């Protein structure tokens, strides 16, 4: 009996979703796993992070070798994104199978066999008959060219360049399996279009039911030289069909379609699944990013790290949650922020909340199921891009054409709807965390709006960014509404149920872009918070030094040099500095209306009240020392605060930045050093949006991947032991 693991065949080092008979290249049923559930389960083994690392490694390879069974979403994303460099190679071993199905169609037609789409009309009009097979294919492409370019208008209704390249790759992969009845030379021509960066213009208008008929017909139109065909050249210029062929180095002229070939080109789900592949590559990266951002959020918010304890998550059983918690635990383990926060939490514990708010404390429980959804969708789309989606299917071994419905793109529509829901929920978490971060009622001492200027009345920090985040989140949540519940009966009620796969993919692509906007804004805010914690530590250090100096100078001795009762106040005065949030008073540290001076005075008053009879003696009265202490503090403290700020701004702070020794440092370094962003203040000209723009562009270009993975480079794939 063959095991499930053995059922996953290997090709070029990648797992195949098909089990093949090497002798005749026909599908066979695996007796150990006849329904493919075992193969699906096997594909989910290992951690999500390891899978993302494999995806990134695969994405960066210079060649994609197509054989019909081992295409991955990362390969699709690579071809889609890399206009130059990554090349497609076709497996020569597939040529014989492709030719056999093509020959079968011609022989069948010559014998007078009645076959759908070869001798019949299409869809609801399949009762019509013709013997003009080539003319029928030509008409198929003509009537499916029903899209609208919108020439002369501001809006363009062509699909993105990346989506078209992805669609061409996926369609080639499907056709290579030899069940479609098309010449190998046509697949080679499409490959040349990809490799020479010539991209047909595809239009909207598909319900992904009998495949993506309308957009795919524009690829067929270009291959056959239709006069309305357009393509983008290597520099983005618009080309007609003849120019496109010249640019792609296709030298044999336009194709005269043989029977079934037009149908083979258009009757597939490649546009929806191609775009879905691009979406899911990005979604997987954003999912890992959200885990690391949540950990950094816990660091700058001085959160309690016990929310990542493995026992909590082990008892919940969900693998996505367990992994999310373990990743956050890894980031927080040994973090200087966590160590400092622990000391703060031990100070007056009964006067502080026992636990953090949900956006921090339940982030693993929130993200875990979303990661599972994205991962399952990834595997579903990976199966789809390795599927044969034609109708009819040409079964050469049994000498028959099978009429079915593999063109129904339900796996795409459902996977994309689910992915969009997951993206919206990730966005909601980031927004909740962002809202806590900028609110001084919740953020454990950071300034309101993360303002960093000397004068908070002229610096409103991330207030505009919070409004933008609310806008992004609202739009993202609107997009989370399902597409697949909006099916309309089409094509004379023949296509009465249809998947809407491409529409759902397009909406999910929009959701990806919005989540990238949110992730960019949030990470810039987190870096601002990191720098503010650094500034806070330096300022507090300076305030403590000055308070200590002034206390020693003014409170230790009396007028005649004798030891004074007020000498015992210093410890309590420094405790006030430790307890007070620096940014609550630092813009005017000696103001009588701010908490620092009020509470320092209260310490002296409290000591005076217990000084008893000694207060009646001017030489031993603590009350008499208060004015002297405050006057000297007012003289020294503002100067020291300004000096500390100046040293910080010049890059010479007394206390180094804690982030430098943390596992989250690679992301911070990337944002600050590689992208050249800095601490935002109202005193500077640069706006928050300009800094967010730099990071957004970097995320879209994939530049954040390496620093993100570096944060987790030494994670062993397991939670810390329960101790």
Swiss-Prot record:
InterPro entries: Aromatic_Lyase, Fumarase/histidase_N, L-Aspartase-like, Phe/His_NH3-lyase_AS, Phe_NH3-lyase, Phe_NH3-lyase_shielding_dom_sf. Pfam families: Lyase_aromatic (PF00221). It comes from the Eukaryota. Present at high levels in roots, with slightly higher amounts in roots with nodules than those without, and at moderate levels in stems. Low levels also present in lower leaves. GO terms for cellular component: cytoplasm. The modification 2,3-didehydroalanine (Ser) is found at residue 210. Keywords: Cytoplasm, Lyase, Phenylalanine catabolism, Phenylpropanoid metabolism. Its EC number is 4.3.1.24. Pathway: Phenylpropanoid metabolism; trans-cinnamate biosynthesis; trans-cinnamate from L-phenylalanine: step 1/1. There is a cross-link at residues 209-211 (5-imidazolinone (Ala-Gly)). The active site is at 116 (proton donor/acceptor). Disulfide bonds: none annotated. (E)-cinnamate binds at residues 267, 355, 361, 391, 463, 491, 494. Contains an active site 4-methylidene-imidazol-5-one (MIO), which is formed autocatalytically by cyclization and dehydration of residues Ala-Ser-Gly. One of its GO terms (molecular function) is phenylalanine ammonia-lyase activity. It catalyses: L-phenylalanine = (E)-cinnamate + NH4(+). GO terms for biological process: cinnamic acid biosynthetic process; L-phenylalanine catabolic process. It is found in: Cytoplasm. Belongs to the PAL/histidase family. Homotetramer. This is a key enzyme of plant metabolism catalyzing the first reaction in the biosynthesis from L-phenylalanine of a wide variety of natural products based on the phenylpropane skeleton. This is Phenylalanine ammonia-lyase 1.
């Amino acid at each position: 009996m063959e095991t499930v693991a053995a059922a996953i065949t290997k090709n070029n080092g990648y797992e195949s979703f098909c089990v093949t008979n090497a002798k005749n290249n026909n599908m066979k049923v695996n007796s150990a796993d006849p329904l493919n559930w075992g193969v699906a389960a096997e594909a989910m083994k290992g951690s999500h992070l390891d899978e993302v690392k494999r995806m990134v490694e695969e994405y960066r390879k210079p060649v994609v070798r197509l054989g019909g069974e081992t295409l991955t979403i990362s390969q699709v994303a690579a071809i889609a994104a890399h206009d130059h460099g990554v090349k497609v190679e076709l497996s020569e071993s597939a040529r014989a199978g492709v030719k056999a199905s093509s020959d079968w169609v011609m022989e069948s037609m010559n014998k007078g066999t009645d076959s759908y789409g070869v001798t019949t009309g299409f869809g609801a009009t399949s009762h019509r008959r013709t013997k003009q097979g080539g003319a029928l294919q030509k008409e198929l492409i003509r009537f499916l060219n029903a899209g609208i370019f919108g020439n002369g208008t501001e809006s363009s209704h062509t699909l993105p360049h990346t989506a078209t390249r992805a669609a061409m790759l996926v369609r080639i992969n499907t056709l290579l399996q030899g069940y479609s009845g098309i010449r190998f030379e046509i697949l080679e021509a499409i490959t040349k279009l990809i490799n020479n960066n010539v991209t047909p213009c595809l239009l909207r208008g598909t319900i992904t039911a009998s495949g993506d008929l309308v957009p795919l017909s524009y690829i067929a139109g270009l291959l056959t030289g239709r006069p309305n065909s357009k393509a983008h050249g290597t520099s983005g210029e618009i080309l007609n069909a003849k120019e496109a062929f010249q640019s792609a180095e296709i030298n044999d002229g336009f194709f005269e379609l043989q029977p079934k070939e037009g149908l083979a080109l258009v009757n597939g789900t490649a546009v929806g699944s191609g775009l879905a592949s691009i979406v899911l590559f990005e979604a997987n990266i954003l999912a890992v990013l959200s885990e690391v951002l949540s950990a950094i959020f816990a660091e700058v918010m001085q959160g309690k790290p016990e929310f990542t304890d493995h026992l909590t998550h082990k008892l919940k059983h969900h693998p996505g949650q367990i992994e999310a918690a373990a990743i956050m635990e890894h980031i927080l383990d040994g973090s200087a922020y966590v160590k400092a926060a622990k000391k703060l939490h031990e100070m007056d514990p009964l006067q502080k909340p026992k636990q953090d708010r949900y956006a921090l404390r339940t982030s693993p429980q929130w993200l875990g199921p979303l990661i599972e959804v994205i991962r399952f969708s990834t595997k579903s789309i990976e199966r789809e891009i390795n599927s044969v989606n034609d109708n009819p299917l040409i079964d050469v071994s049994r000498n028959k054409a099978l009429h079915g419905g593999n063109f129904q793109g339900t796996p795409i529509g459902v996977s994309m709807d689910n992915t969009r829901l997951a993206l919206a929920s990730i966005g909601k978490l980031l927004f909740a965390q962002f809202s806590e971060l900028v609110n001084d009622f919740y953020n454990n001492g950071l300034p309101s709006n993360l303002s960093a200027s000397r004068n908070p009345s002229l610096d409103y920090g991330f207030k505009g960014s919070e409004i933008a985040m609310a806008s992004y989140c609202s739009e993202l949540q609107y997009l989370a509404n399902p597409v697949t519940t909006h099916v309309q009966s089409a094509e004379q009620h023949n296509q009465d149920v249809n998947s809407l796969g491409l529409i759902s993919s397009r909406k999910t692509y929009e959701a990806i872009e919005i989540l990238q906007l949110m992730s960019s804004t949030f990470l810039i805010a987190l870096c601002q918070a990191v720098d503010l914690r650094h500034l806070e530590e330096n300022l507090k250090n300076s305030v403590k030094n000055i308070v200590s100096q002034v206390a020693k100078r003014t409170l230790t001795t009396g007028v005649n040099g004798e030891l004074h009762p007020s000498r015992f106040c210093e410890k309590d005065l420094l405790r006030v500095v430790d307890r007070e949030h620096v940014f609550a008073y630092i813009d005017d540290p000696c103001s009588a209306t701010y908490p620092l001076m009020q509470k320092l005075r209260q310490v002296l008053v409290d000591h005076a009240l217990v000084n008893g009879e000694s207060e009646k003696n001017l030489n031993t009265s603590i009350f008499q020392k208060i004015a002297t202490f405050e006057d000297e503090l007012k003289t020294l403290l503002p100067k020291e605060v300004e000096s500390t700020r100046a040293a910080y701004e010049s890059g010479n702070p007394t206390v180094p930045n804690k982030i430098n020794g943390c596992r989250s440092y690679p992301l911070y370094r990337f944002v600050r050093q590689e992208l050249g962003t800095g601490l935002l203040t109202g005193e500077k000209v640069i706006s928050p949006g300009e800094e967010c723009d730099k990071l957004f562009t970097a995320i879209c270009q994939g530049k954040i991947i390496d620093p993100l993975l570096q944060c987790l480079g030494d994670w062993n794939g397991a939670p810390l032991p329960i101790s």
